[in-house]
Curated annotation (Swiss-Prot):
Entry-linked InterPro entries: Ribosome_recyc_fac, Ribosome_recyc_fac_dom, RRF_sf
Alphabetized UniProt keyword annotations: Cytoplasm, Protein biosynthesis
HAMAP family recorded: RRF
Localization per record: Cytoplasm
Single GO MF annotation: ribosomal large subunit binding
Family: Belongs to the RRF family.
Alphabetical GO biological process terms: cytoplasmic translational termination
Protein name: Ribosome-recycling factor
GO CC annotation: cytosol
CDD domains noted in UniProt: RRF
Function noted in UniProt: Responsible for the release of ribosomes from messenger RNA at the termination of protein biosynthesis. May increase the efficiency of translation by recycling ribosomes from one round of translation to another.
Amino acid sequence: MDKEHLKKNLQEKMEKALKVLDHELKGLRTGRASVNLLDSVTVEAYGSKMPLSQVASLSTPDARTINVQVWDKSMVSSVEKGITIANLGLTPATDGQLIRLPIPALTEERRTELVKLAHKYGEDTKISLRNIRRDGNEALKKLAKDNVIAKDEHHSLSEQVQKLTDDYSNKVDSVIKQKEQEIMTV
């Protein structure tokens, strides 16, 4: 593995960690209706568990409602059950094949819990960034030990890896801060 490949590999891994954080944060309720809230919902369908999006179409007609249009009439009760089991704090209101999910306003207490959860996701992401940095530094040490790179080049590359880690750590902080503002906005 050469140094350019190593840097590119580290950057790709850090980018993936940031994408995972984005995905986790989309699942946090902010008081506004978003079909992303239902990403974690699975439904017992045709003898197996399926994501809700594969048995129904999801839409947000307004800021406080999510509509779930179930395609197969026989699946309505299974979809309701899946939404309830997901423990999202949403109460399904069924009208034929249409399930309406009114989004209740978030209490101050719940907002604080969500902010703490967002910070936990951010910290988990920073831990994975540090692990990626550690792996990169170990690879650099191996390159230096095998005389593929000189000692001063090793030092320079280590600094670049640290700068990359710091940049992504700052991105995590900014994403978390933005999500915190979104959650706390009434």
